[in-house]
Regions:
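Bacterial N-terminal signal peptides
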Residues: 9-17
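A helicase ATPase "motif cassette" and its flanking acidic/Ser/Thr-rich regulatory loops
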Residues: 43, 152, 345
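Extracytoplasmic/periplasmic proteins that interact with beta-lactams or build/remodel peptidoglycan
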Residues: 1-2, 16, 21-60, 80-82, ...
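Bacterial N-terminal signal peptides that target proteins for export
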Residues: 1-9
Length: 362
């Protein structure tokens, strides 16, 4: 397969990003970009190779510094024809995302009704939710049986996630959405330099389209649309001990979205669980021998039958400096957030870690 490897492509992407917000162009010209061109080029090369390997439709990767909220690399490539991948600028394009699963668990922890060590019975991998069957990915192999909530998250068990929601919220799904709103999930609504970014969209109990099965599918990634940059913003807040800040493409004053998204003890518990995802769960392809990683895999099937496979996380796990999201759009199976997006995350993370002294000097 022939891949577009023109050396100036990553720099073209940077220029597109920096010029996209016309309403504030006069101000932006006076500010310096946060993008690191060297990292942008390297990330583009890694994505090109992975797209070629997977024959995927598109891929997006965003790298952000945890404390400064500066976006250091922002790359998106898509297949324009049967052979070539070219840069695009669909950073405002939203889709369903299974990366909400740890956020659902955080909301459950906030109620005080559950702990990560609590057991849930996933049975043989099929759970009846009114007139629909909720399945785990290994249902045809007999499911996971009884596992802890922490193990359920690491295994991406849909049943474990939803049963945790049942225990924490009972029949009050609106209480769950109230907590998501309190935690600022789906923010920000706009970022200077990213055109047409819209608020994340959720189907809630207040909507006419709400059904008695909507909650079960929402808490695992469906019945919503959210962009990768909005998802990364939340994971970056987890890495930043609960402080959510506005991602920036220009070096400007810090804007705090939420000074504390959740109780510190619950955030600390979730951070331990996200480490476990990588050391013992489906996130192991993101595991690095060079730096400790924490994060979560995600795989959803869209209405057209295609798949979104993702990995979002941060490193070093014990003292996070960078957060990264990788989102890949595939036409067909196999589709694995860990094996596909997690591997890209690892490659980018290791490159940053090896050149850590260089990036810290920026």
């Amino acid at each position: 397969m022939r891949i577009v490897k023109t050396i100036f492509i990553p720099l073209v992407i940077v220029c597109i990003i920096l010029c996209s917000c016309k309403s504030k162009e006069h101000k932006n010209e006076q500010l310096s970009t946060t993008i690191d061109s060297t990292l942008q080029v390297k990330a583009t090369s890694i994505l090109e190779n992975k797209l070629s390997e997977l024959n995927a439709l598109s891929v997006q990767a965003i790298v952000m510094e945890v404390q400064t909220r500066h976006i250091k690399a922002m790359v998106e490539l898509e297949r324009k024809d049967s052979a070539d991948y070219q840069p695009c600028e669909n950073f405002s394009q939203a889709h369903e995302s299974a990366l909400i699963q740890p956020i659902s668990i955080l909301a459950a922890l906030e109620t005080g009704e559950v702990k990560l060590s609590d057991k849930v019975d996933t049975g043989e991998g099929i759970y009846q939710v009114h007139d629909r069957e909720l399945k785990d990915h290994n249902w045809h192999r007999g499911g996971y049986g009884e596992i802890s909530i922490k193990q359920g998250l690491a295994s991406s068990s849909n049943i474990a996630i939803y049963k945790t929601m049942e225990k924490a919220f009972g029949n009050d799904a609106q209480a769950y959405f109230n907590l998501l709103d309190k935690m600022s999930y789906g923010k920000p609504d706009s970022i200077t330099g990213i055109t047409n970014l819209k608020p994340a969209h959720f189907i809630t109990p207040k909507d006419s389209s709400w059904s008695n099965t909507a909650f079960a599918w929402y808490c695992i990634g469906y019945n919503q649309t959210i962009t990768p940059i909005q998802t990364l913003t939340f994971y970056n807040a987890i890495a930043n001990r609960g402080r959510m800040v506005q991602p920036q493409l220009y070096k400007d004053s810090t804007m705090v979205i939420n000074p504390q998204i959740a109780n510190q003890a619950d955030i600390d518990s979730l951070r331990q669980a996200l480490e476990y995802v990588v050391t013992d769960g489906l996130g192991q392809p993101a595991k690095s021998s060079k730096v400790q990683v924490a994060g979560k895999t995600g795989t959803v099937q869209l209405e057209d039958g295609s798949y979104i496979v993702e990995f979002c996380g941060y490193f070093p796990a014990n003292a996070p400096q960078y957060s990264i999201i990788v989102s890949i759009h595939k036409e067909e199976l196999p589709a694995s957030g860990g094996l596909m997006a997690g591997d890209v995350f690892r490659q980018i993370a290791e490159y940053i870690f090896i050149h850590n002294k260089y990036f810290n000097s920026k």
